[in-house]
Curated annotation (Swiss-Prot):
Repeat listed as a keyword: yes
Ranges for region Type E(+) motif: 700-730
GO molecular function, one term: zinc ion binding
Gene3D superfamilies: Tetratricopeptide repeat domain
TM segment ranges: none
Assigned protein family: Belongs to the PPR family. PCMP-H subfamily.
UniProt-recorded name of the protein: Putative pentatricopeptide repeat-containing protein At2g01510
Repeat positions for PPR: 47-77, 78-108, 109-143, 146-180, 183-213, 214-248, 249-283, 284-314, 315-349, 350-384, 385-415, 416-450, 451-485, 486-516, 517-551, 552-587, 588-618
The keyword Repeat belongs to this UniProt entry's keyword annotation: yes
Lineage, opening ranks: Eukaryota, Viridiplantae, Streptophyta, Embryophyta, Tracheophyta
Cited PROSITE patterns: PPR
Type E motif: annotated segments: 623-699
UniProt record, GO biological process: RNA modification
Species of the source: Arabidopsis thaliana
Length: 825
């Protein structure tokens, strides 16, 4: 097939390669004479060809203006002249000048079209690139694309390219015969383009039609499967590639290792690691980094560090992975160490893991660290990179600097779904759930589609209100948006229903999920754990392993939480001790905190202290608070005072819970002077007790109550109901437990104050506002007191209703005078 209509153009292009003879040397004039002789012999215009050489030489030296001056002054130009000048402008990014020359050309060659088309494609101006391709194919000059045109136009494709555009190019390639074996590169770029525009179905058809495939063909589809989440298919194709005799490359290992990470298949990943070692690819920087990332994503911090230390060549990716690995393990000091080391290595600052480090600052609520990182990002101009801007939004929001967060959010060059989710998440994480849901409504108005992370965040906000109606509305919206089959959205729904007290709905959503991964199982395990069903949580964990999935750190945390809530000390200890040797998971701070809670609740303080001494890090606020709470339950005043001393010495301690717990311990012992000392210390540090609130949803409206609240429109009816219930439960044997009252007042005043705690007001209001037999769900922002717990147990028996109270510790399902927690919380 004839691809060039102007044979002189081919000859002219051939002569242009003679510029290689004109390297600066003492023989320059001799070389020039030889070129001129060749030009005269072939019948070309000597002046034009010599000028073309000069233009190209000037462009090669970066002197674009001088080259353009020579070009403009040429009396006779040919297509080589203009193509050379267009190429020069394109290489310097001056596409406007290049386009002017292109539009003014009376005759264009395939080279002309390809040069300009390539610039548009490389710079993501796909509409213009494909428009030029169509114009070229329809032009009257008989200029048809060659294989270089196809391999220039297609490689830059991404999901912004219309799917039909790739199909049209494919059809033209077939028409011109470029789908045959001599042009395998064209078939390979077409295959990659179909993968990039998410048409795996067409990619698979093309793959099967390619008569003789090479390693690039296999690598392209392996990567395409992995990017689309079809991890099993990616692994199967890799095995097929090996069986067909094609040798894997560094790209092969990178793609298939990513697929293994997606499958959470640790054993298979280890096999691939071994194969990369035997084939020698493990020493390749890109493969080594992917192996490093594989171990990091499986929470194997020790293995990640060992491989990092053994790598022959470290680049910025290696440092990014090891910093992220320590961050995921909550070992922030180690992350900071490697970040400082990375700064001394001479890497381009734009490649620094600012997003990861900002996430650490957000998790630590360290505004100072966050601002330092912000300054570094500005110096590196990395704040213009969208994901760093999103991380800045997240950091400022989680440090409760919402004005700064919104300012950065508004200044982002492009507000994506991730940007909106970062801001929404910041509000939700700080307990401003209403503000988060309002932002979600605004996001919907901006015509952006919510993704799995967005839904997980708004479902969390919905769960915080315990509003089953709101949760079901979000469930319906997820169905309409086509995200129900997404495992992360499904997992978020499981979590939401569980936190709204509807474990039955949570289990149903889980069972209806078409695909389940570790996140789905973790949601179910946590749902059972939070609702006090330890046996079901442990059963779900066992089924997860039976399904072939490898448990991760979150899975173990869910089981430990279940054991803690149910008092399964021996089982909890077994799971904790099995983490490293059996499951290959390094315990994080949360796992240690859960074990301390389990041991402390059971009064096993010697074991708890031994565990704290053996931890690889210092006990933090959560751990000492857990010990203090256990001491309050078991009246261990000496250890309580030690725990309180540790807590009160923490500069960052802003939570009043530790002070309140210590006050309760002293009040129960009748040491009122020490109660006053604790309250004085609170005032001096400017720490205020968080007021107790409870809320209940009745008739699609949330009603909020505080202790001794007299502001509700139905206040008189509520008080009458409480007095009526108090009289009835007293006949059932109820005796007020005044040990939780920290005011030094007479006994009768203590009893009266207990009657009007926020959770009892909410229960009383629900009883007078809902039909008989209707279940009641009450939420509380603090831990339920022991007296209210005892009272609501008896109330559930008297009124013959299921009453659910969710506090900060767990769910309490009251029915027939019994609580699901077994009085253990």
């Amino acid at each position: 097939m004839k691809l060039y209509c102007n044979s002189n153009e081919v000859r002219s292009r051939t002569l242009a390669t003679l510029r290689q003879l004109r390297q600066p040397s003492p023989a320059t004039f001799l070389d020039t004479r030889r070129v001129d002789a060749r030009i005269i012999k072939t019948g070309f215009d000597t002046d034009t060809c010599r000028s073309n050489f000069i233009v190209e030489d000037l462009l090669r030296r970066g002197q674009v203006s001088a080259a353009r001056k020579v070009y403009d002054e040429m009396p006779h130009k040919n297509t080589v002249s203009t193509n050379t000048m267009i190429s020069g402008h394109v290489k310097t990014g001056d596409v406007s000048s290049a386009r002017d020359l292109f539009d003014a050309m009376p005759d264009r060659t395939v080279v002309t079209w390809t040069i300009l088309m390539g610039w548009y494609a490389r710079n993501s101006h796909f509409d213009e690139a494909f428009k030029l391709f169509r114009q070229m194919c329809r032009s009257s000059s008989c200029t048809l694309p060659d294989h270089v045109t196809f391999t220039t136009l297609l490689p830059g494709c991404n999901d912004a390219v219309p799917q039909n555009a790739v199909g049209q190019v494919h059809a033209f390639a077939v028409k011109l015969g470029f789908d045959t074996n001599p042009f395998l590169t064209v078939s390979n770029v077409l295959l990659k383009s179909y993968c990039e525009v998410r048409r795996l179905d067409l990619a698979c058809v093309l793959f099967e039609e390619i008569p003789e495939k090479d390693s690039v063909t296999f690598n392209t589809l392996i990567t395409g499967y992995e990017k689309d989440g079809l991890y099993t298919e990616s692994i199967h194709l890799f095995l097929k590639m090996r069986q067909s005799g094609h040798q894997p490359s560094d790209f092969t290992f990178s793609g298939v290792l990513k697929a293994v990470v997606g499958l959470h298949d640790f054993a298979l990943g280890q096999q691939l690691h071994a194969l990369s070692v035997t084939t020698g690819f493990s020493r390749d920087a890109s493969v080594g980094n992917q192996i490093l990332d594989f171990y990091s994503k499986h929470d194997r911090v020790l293995e990640t560090r060992m491989l990092f230390d053994e790598m022959p060549e470290l680049d910025f990716v290696s440092y990014n992975v090891v910093i992220s690995s320590y961050s995921q393990a909550d070992q922030y000091e180690a992350s900071l160490h490697f970040f400082r080391e990375m700064q001394c290595m001479g890497f381009d600052r734009r490649n620094f893991p600012f997003a990861t480090m900002l996430s650490i600052a957000a998790n630590l609520s360290s505004l100072q660290m966050g601002r330092q990182l912000h300054c570094q990002a500005l110096l590196a101009t990395a704040d213009s990179i969208l994901h760093v801007g999103n991380s800045l939004v997240d950091m400022y929001a989680k440090c409760e600097m919402f004005e700064e967060a919104e300012l950065i959010f508004k200044s982002l060059p492009q507000r994506t779904t991730v940007s909106w989710t970062a801001l929404i998440s910041g509000y939700v994480q700080k307990g401003l759930h209403g503000a988060g849901l309002k932002l979600f409504t605004k996001m919907r108005g901006s015509n952006l589609r919510a993704d799995q992370s967005t839904f997980a965040t708004v479902l969390k906000a919905s769960a915080s209100f315990a509003s089953l109606l709101l949760g079901k509305q979000l469930h319906a919206f997820i169905i309409r948006s086509g995200n129900l089959e997404n495992v992360f959205s499904g997992s978020g729904l499981v979590d939401m229903y569980a936190k709204c007290g509807s474990i039955k709905d949570a289990v149903q959503v889980f069972e209806e999920m078409p695909d389940r991964n570790a996140v789905s199982w973790n949601a179910l395990i946590s749902a059972h754990a939070d609702n006090g069903d330890g046996e079901a949580a442990i059963g779900a964990f066992a089924k997860m392993i039976e399904s072939g999935l490898q448990p991760d750190s979150v899975s173990i945390l869910g089981v430990l939480t279940a054991c803690s809530h149910c008092g399964f000390v021996e089982q909890g200890t077994e799971y904790f001790q099995a983490m490293s040797p059996i499951y290959g998971i390094t315990p994080k701070k949360k796992h240690y905190a859960c074990m301390l809670d389990l041991l402390g609740r059971n009064g096993r303080f010697a074991e708890a202290e031994k565990l704290m001494d053996e931890m690889p890090f210092e006990p933090d606020e959560i751990m000492w608070s857990s010990v203090l709470n256990a001491c309050r339950i078991h009246k261990n005043q000496s250890l309580a005072e030690r725990a309180a001393e540790k807590l009160f010495s923490m500069e960052k301690l802003r939570d009043a819970a530790a002070y309140v717990s210590m006050s309760n311990i002293y009040a129960a012992a009748g040491e009122w002077e020490k109660v006053r000392d604790v309250k004085k210390a609170m005032r001096e540090r400017g720490i205020k007790k968080v007021p107790a609130y409870s809320w209940v949803e009745v008739n699609h409206k949330i009603h909020v109550f505080s202790s001794n609240d007299q502001t509700h429109p139905n206040g008189d009816e509520i008080v009458r109901k409480i007095n009526e219930l108090t009289a009835e439960i007293e006949r059932e044997g109820y005796k007020p437990d005044t040990s939780s009252v920290v005011q030094d007042v007479d006994e009768q005043m203590k009893i009266e104050s207990l009657k009007y705690h926020s959770e009892r007001l909410a229960v009383a209001f629900a009883l007078i506002s809902t039909p008989e037999g209707c279940p009641i769900v009450v939420m509380k922002n603090l831990r339920a007191c022991r007296d209210c717990h005892a009272a609501i147990k008896l109330i559930s028996k008297i009124v013959k209703r299921e009453i659910t109270v969710r506090d900060t510790s767990r769910f309490h399902h009251f029915s027939e005078g019994v609580c699901s927690c077994g009085d253990y919380w």
